[in-house]
Amino acid sequence: MQYANRDFRGAKMDSGTRRITNTWLIREGGSASRGDFLLHSDGSVSDSKGDEDVIETIDGKNRLVTRSLQNWHTHLGMVLNRGMGEGLPLMEWLETAIFPVEKRLTGKLVEIGTRAAAAEMIATGTTYACDMYYYTQTVGETLAETGVRATLCGPITDGLTPNFKPGSGDALRHMESLINDPSPRPGRIDYGIGTHSVYVCDEEILRKGSELAKKTGSLLHIHTSETRKEVADCHAKHGMYPIEYLDSLDYFQDAESGGTVCAHCGGVTKKEMRILAGHGAHAVHCPTSNQKLACGGTMSYPAMKEAGVDVRLGTDGSASNNSLDLRAEAKAASLVQRHDHWDARILGPEQTWDLATKGSQDWITWDLSDIRMRPFGRDGRRLLSNLIYSGAKVLDVFVGGEAVRRDGRTLTLDEDVVAEELEESVTEYYQDV
């Protein structure tokens, strides 16, 4: 299922077909081709004969064209928390460094953090985020101005929601009103339901969130089996592991109806993998965050693949990664899977790139004059490997045919202003902390 594919009505530049000449293109499956290509606003690509009507012709001599990156688990506003609470395990980190300061959150702070997150995403080639954070409507309006795509899964756990009274049910009602609002949604934004986890949400909240998602055909988003402690505690309390427990509540929203995103899936049994596969759930691998917070393990990609589970990649939030660079996350995913399974054949460049770009309809270009991309060989056989494991600067980002970044400069926001605004806001946010 594709998410957030609406046309962007606030375009800063004309959208349409662009010709890019004398360039390299990474095709579906990971092969590299050189030539002249047409990038169409519907996300398709074709060879150019040179006589087509286009809105722009780009000299691609030092460019590599690829699909854009897709980030399937984020907390974008947590750019505000980047660099705080270092050296703490997950639960201590949440309870001492994150939850206490989030009580101070305001819509304005979330707007500033989200705008900074969008700037980082665009600059590193990501055009889609599946997000779970507070002030969901504000997040949507902010992201719409930048031109990126997103599915925003507002948290419905009243006790942890700074913008609603604990226990009031207002968070659930707010998300229902956002999803059912008949007026046009901002930009390329969709809404979903965020049920944080089995250790934060009680059975009633999990059931209500699932019921609302099913009633509205919306995406469900949850953290599952992120740490050994979470897995052990769930089994001790319910006699079931987290995904088994969720299935016993009829929690999952099947793929054809709206879908379910399960972030982390670190300590998951084969039975649980079969449950995920049966519901068509997206299991999101977040290797950097799992390692940084010493969660006790990361997802087993080979086992997930064997079970038929759809695996995606996510960075998690900027407070636990600390980056939103999904290209770097793709590298981390490949390396940790090889390391954990003692097998250098796992997640080669083609498979890794498929995980990082799965579902993308948009295009980005990378700077081939960047020394990190050299040598790539006259036949281009090293291009994809160099990109994943070495990296390069993002030159252009095209979303739905609209240019949101050109020649290394983002067009839909001013990065210098965004950075200064962020610095000023965190001074207030972390006052006396």
Locations of the language-model features?
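Divalent metal-coordination and catalytic microenvironments
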Residues: 23, 62, 73, 125, ...
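A conserved active-site cap/scaffold subdomain adjacent to cofactor or substrate pockets
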Residues: 271, 277-309, 314-315
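Active-site gating loops and adjacent loop-to-helix segments of metal-dependent hydrolytic enzymes
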Residues: 80-112, 151-172, 227-257, 279-282, ...
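Active-site microenvironment of metallo-dependent hydrolases
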Residues: 2-35, 40-42, 46, 50, ...
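Metal-coordinating catalytic core of metallo-dependent amide/deamination hydrolases
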Residues: 139-266, 271
